[in-house]
């Protein structure tokens, strides 16, 4: 089920969209690129579709915010949900000074 609302401007659309404890996805419809950018930046959701309905592709992350969950599945961000990143500091060996951090995935 989806709800459709006609609003006066981008500000009203953002207020209406954010007035919920959920934030999985939004679909906005406009012919104005600047308005689309304001909506994308302003709506608190895991994904925004402009002039399109919800779509999914295994190459891009999928997930929500607020009570719609946290973290992502699919894409490189989804893969990282299943790994632990370990930080390792390695000092120069054989009498050398200094050290540098390395992230190992």
Where is each model-derived feature located?
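Conserved C-terminal structural/oligomerization subdomain of aldehyde/semialdehyde dehydrogenase
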Residues: 1-105
């Amino acid at each position: 089920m989806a709800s459709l609302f006609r609003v006066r401007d981008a500000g009203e659309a953002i207020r209406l969209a954010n007035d919920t404890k959920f934030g999985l996805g939004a679909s906005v419809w406009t012919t104005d690129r600047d308005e689309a950018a304001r909506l994308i930046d302003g709506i608190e959701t895991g994904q925004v579709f402009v002039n399109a309905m919800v779509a999914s592709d295994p190459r891009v992350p999928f997930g929500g915010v607020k009570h719609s969950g946290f973290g992502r599945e699919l894409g490189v961000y989804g893969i990282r949900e299943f790994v632990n990143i370990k930080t390792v500091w390695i000092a120069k060996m054989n009498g050398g000074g200094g050290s540098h951090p390395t992230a190992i995935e």
